[in-house]
Amino acid sequence: MAELLLGVNIDHIATLRNARGTAYPDPVQAAFIAEQAGADGITVHLREDRRHITDRDVCILRQTLDTRMNLEMAVTEEMLAIAVETKPHFCCLVPEKRQEVTTEGGLDVAGQREKMRDACKRLADAGIQVSLFIDADEDQIKAAAEVGAPFIEIHTGCYADAKTDAEQAQELARIAKAATFATSLGLKVNAGHGLTYHNVKAIAAIPEMHELNIGHAIIGRAVMTGLKDAVAEMKRLMLEARG
């Protein structure tokens, strides 16, 4: 059974800050509190439109984090150049559309193998570990292994958005099967998107899961309970799921 880690996404601290054009709340301070509460890493998505996290945030976080930085980004020349210069510990390559509210699905790695292979190599040559954000699909998982990514992050949005218990159980089984298949190919398996305090335990209980990246639910809970308690409670639920 893989060690289970929690990556806390702090994008929406920046969303709150940018809503008023102020210097607060500060994502760097939020990252420090999350680390104190047990976060194993900090995830930020530097979007092309800079709607929340900024280049300055990325630079300061890379210099100040005690744990690991996971930079989510689109596969563009601009973002690859920023990553190579900043050298986060991890980069998670994601699809990105300007009009979307949040990432809506996984990368089509199988349909753009050469582009993904080049991106993975460029990042790896800079000493950055790469994960590909993909759906729980065997063809995409095979393609991820073929292009040289050591990690995948399984998109859990369909599981999180399931309208019935039966639909959620079906999505859970699909994710579990995908995690087993990916592990058989030598990939390490992360997961994220839409995970909350109500649905995280079933995903955390999947033996092959290495890390869960969770943001919106934690920041939403933090508004009510405080960020430290929110992170600590999420970590407790994850570890409890492992017995």
Swiss-Prot record:
Primary residence: cytoplasm
Binding site for 1-deoxy-D-xylulose 5-phosphate: D11, H12, R47, H52, T102
Active site: H45 (proton acceptor), E72 (proton acceptor), H193 (proton donor)
Site (Transition state stabilizer): E153
Top enzyme class: transferase
Disulfide bonds: none
GO MF terms, alphabetically ordered: pyridoxine 5'-phosphate synthase activity
Reaction equations catalysed: 3-amino-2-oxopropyl phosphate + 1-deoxy-D-xylulose 5-phosphate = pyridoxine 5'-phosphate + phosphate + 2 H2O + H(+)
Function of the molecule: Catalyzes the complicated ring closure reaction between the two acyclic compounds 1-deoxy-D-xylulose-5-phosphate (DXP) and 3-amino-2-oxopropyl phosphate (1-amino-acetone-3-phosphate or AAP) to form pyridoxine 5'-phosphate (PNP) and inorganic phosphate.
Family statement drawn from the similarity comment of this UniProt entry: Belongs to the PNP synthase family.
Identification of the protein by name: Pyridoxine 5'-phosphate synthase
Species name: Escherichia coli O6:H1 (strain CFT073 / ATCC 700928 / UPEC)
Biological classification of the source: Bacteria, Pseudomonadati, Pseudomonadota, Gammaproteobacteria, Enterobacterales
Gene name of the record: pdxJ
